[in-house]
Design a protein with these regions (language model features):
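Cytosolic juxtamembrane helix and N-cap/initiation of the first transmembrane helix
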Residues: 1-39
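Cytoplasmic juxtamembrane regions at transmembrane-helix boundaries
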Residues: 7-11, 85-109
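Alpha-helical transmembrane segments of integral membrane proteins
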Residues: 16-26, 70-78, 109-112, 141, ...
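Hydrophobic alpha-helical transmembrane segments of multi-pass integral membrane proteins
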Residues: 23, 27-30, 75-85, 112-123
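Membrane-interfacial helix-loop-helix connectors in multipass membrane proteins
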Residues: 42-60, 125-141
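Membrane-helix boundary elements
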Residues: 50-79
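Hydrophobic alpha-helical transmembrane segments of integral membrane proteins
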Residues: 96-129
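Alpha-helical transmembrane segments of multi-pass integral membrane proteins
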Residues: 118-171
Length: 171
């Protein structure tokens, strides 16, 4: 058992560093997307850089381009928050005596709630950008599934924390 926990701690220590770097890259991507969007709105000219960044050619009209930009900002923000939060969970696991803590459970609930709310936002934005219904529903169900799985993992982590506390009090 000791070898398993020490291996987990070591992997989580390195993974948390990778997650921190990835989270920063995603956060910078959010800032770049917002900046390109603001510049495009101020100048009234949607730049080719923004269009290639969000994956559109510019023929769709302002409403769709704004919605596509918002969709990209949302997706990058979700990714950034997820990666940073999972990095915090891994950092906690690398430092604590048990991976099962209330704080880690709360972090997993946070991710679950973000994905739950985002599933509806992405569905709405998908229809605004005139994505095919099957694509929008697939994205909706995918993010909803992630939300449910993360919530179940949070409940398991919380239950593990309770069992760990009872075990510690028994000894």
């Amino acid at each position: 058992m000791k070898h398993g926990l020490s291996r987990l701690k070591k992997i989580c220590r390195y993974a948390s560093n990778v997650m921190t770097i990835a989270g920063m890259i995603l956060a910078i991507s959010v800032i770049v997307t917002i900046g390109l969007g603001i510049i495009s709105l101020i100048t009234g000219n949607v730049s080719d850089i923004l269009l290639s960044w969000i994956g559109h050619n510019g023929d769709e009209g302002t409403k769709i381009i704004v919605a596509a930009t918002m969709e990209n900002i949302l997706i990058l923000s979700i990714g950034s928050i997820t990666v940073i939060t999972i990095g915090n969970v891994m950092d906690s696991i690398s430092k604590e005596n048990s991976p099962f803590t209330e704080l880690n459970a709360d972090r997993l609930v946070l991710i679950s709630m973000i994905y739950f709310v985002s599933s509806f936002l992405l569905l709405t934005l998908g229809f605004i950008v005139e994505r095919r219904a099957t694509e929008s529903v697939f994205i909706f169900l995918g993010t909803l599934l992630v939300s449910v799985v993360m919530y179940c993992l949070a409940l398991m982590c919380r239950y593990g924390a309770i069992l760990q506390k009872e075990s510690d009090e028994t000894l």
